[in-house]
Amino acid sequence: MKSTLRHKHREGGTALMIAVSSLVFLIPLVGLAVDAGFLYVVKARMQASVDGASLAAARALNLGQTTAAQADSAKQNAVNWFYANYPAGNWMSRNTTMTTSDTHVRVYDDTVNPNLRHVDVMATSQIPTFFMKYLGVDATTVQAIGHASRRDVNAMLVLDRSGSMGSSCGALISAAKTFTGQFSAGRDKIGAVSFADNVYLHSKPTSNFQSTLGYTNSYGTLNGELDTIACAGGTATPQAIMVAYNELYKLNQPGALNVIVVETDGRPNTITVNFWDGSAAGIASTSNCLDKNGKKKSAGGFATLASLREWTPGYNMNVGGTGYMANIPAGLVGGIGGTDSGTTAFLLFNSWTYVKTDTYNETNNKQYPTSTALSGCAMASNRNTLADLAWLPTTDIYGNNLVNGSYRAVSTSGGKISPISMTQIRAAAFNGVDSAGTRIRTNATVPAHVFSVGFTTSVDHTVLQRIANDPDWMGTSACTTSGQCVVNSGQPQGTYVFAATTADLVPAFLSLSSQILRLSR
C-alpha cells in the first residue's frame, strides 16, 4: 500500500515537472500569437489607410492649374488622408512615417498609355510588442503600400441653347463652368458645342479648357467661350451629339476616358439630312425651292453629289452618311424641324451647321450662324406647309437611324420616310438621338460614355435615359409609364440626372463630374 502511494507521488511530481517545462515553451508561443495577432490588426488598419490615401491622391490629380501643382495636391492629399485615418501614436505605434516626398508618394505617367497616371503610396510605422520584448524584440516595423491610377478624361459638353432655355441661360453657363472647374487642366481635355436650330462648336477638346471655356472652382472663376452662349431657336439634339462625338473621334485617344455630357430642357425636334438622291430628289416636283447654288430639284435638291464631295477627308462618302467628318461647310445640307406644339413650324435651312475654325475668335455677343429659309420655298412664307417635301431619308447625314420600330414609330415607303408629317419628323428626331447614343457607346475605335442632364418638367426622361444607358432609372415612374427605357449591359453605362429647377443645375453637373472622375480611376 505504501509502495503504491509513493509511486503515485512520483507520477505527480513528474507531471508537474513536465507542465513547468512546457510553460517555458508555451508562454513564448502564446506571446508570439498575441503579438502576431496585434500586428495583423494594426497592419490591416494601416493598409486600409494607405489604400485610401492612394485613392485620395488620384482624386486630387485634378486640383491645380499645372501638372506640377496637381502632383503636389495629390501628395498632400495622400498625407492628409493617411494621418486622418492613422494618426501618430495610433495603436501605440511609434515613428510613423508618411511624407510628401517621392519616397512615400510618387506620381508618374504610364510608360505605355500616355493618358494614364499612377500614384504609389508607402508608409512605415514601428509597432511595440507585448511578450516578444522579453526575448529582446521591442518593436516590429510594419510597411504598407498602396497604388491607384487615373485616366485622363476627354469630354465634350453638349449644351441646349434653344429658345426655351432663355431665362435659364445664365444658370446653365454657371453649371457648365462649375463642371469644367472639376477637371485637371493640362491633362484632361474638354470641349463644348451648343445647339438650337444649328450647332456651334465653341471649342474642340483641349487641355487648356479652363482658359478657353471658362471655369469656376475653389481657385476662382474665369470667363470664356461658355459665357458667350445666348439662347434662342429649336432643338437639333441628334446633330449636336454627333458634332461633339466627331471631335472625340478625331482626337482618337481610346486610352483616355471619353465622355459626352448632354444637357437639354426640351424634346428633340430637328433632324439634319441630305436631300440629294441619285434617282429622286427630296423636293416635291411642284416646289420652287432653290438649293444653295440657286438651282431647283432638277439639279439634285439641296446638295448635289459634287458639293457632297466637298466634305473634308474623314467622311465616309456613302450617301446618307455613315462616317465622321472633319468639318461641315455651311450651306451644304438641308434640315427640317418641327415644334412640339403639333401645329406649326417646318423650315428648311441652307446654313444649318457651322463649325468654328481654329483661327476664328469671338468676343462677347457671339453671332451664331443664321438659319434662313431657302429661297423660293413655300414654307419660307408659310411655316405650316409641307408642300415642298417629297420624302425624307431614313438616316441623317451622320448615319444615325431615323427609323426605329422598337422606339418611335416612323412610316416608310420605298425605303424613304413617307408620308411627311410633324409627327413623323418628331419621331425621327427621337430615333436619331437614340441611334447616336448607341453608335457612340459601341464605336470600336473610340467608345464613349454618355451622361445626360434633363432640365425642367418639359424634358423627355426616356430618351435621356436611353442615350445614357442608365440602369438606375429603370424602376422610376417615368420608365415604367413609357415602357421604353432600355439598358444594354454590354455597353458603357452613364448616368441621367434630372434638374427640375435652375437651382438644381449646378448640383446636377457636379454629380456627373464626380461620377466621371470616379470612372477615371
List each model region and its residues.
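Alpha-helical hydrophobic helix detector
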Residues: 17-34, 44, 48
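Short, mixed-charge, low-aromatic patches
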Residues: 6-11, 30-37, 194-196
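Short, solvent-exposed cationic patches
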Residues: 11, 19, 272-275
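N-terminal leader/signal peptides at the extreme start of proteins
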Residues: 1-12, 17
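P/S/T/G-enriched low-complexity
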Residues: 2, 37-521
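Short glycine- and Lys/Arg-enriched binding-loop motifs that mark or flank ligand-binding interfaces
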Residues: 9, 27, 262
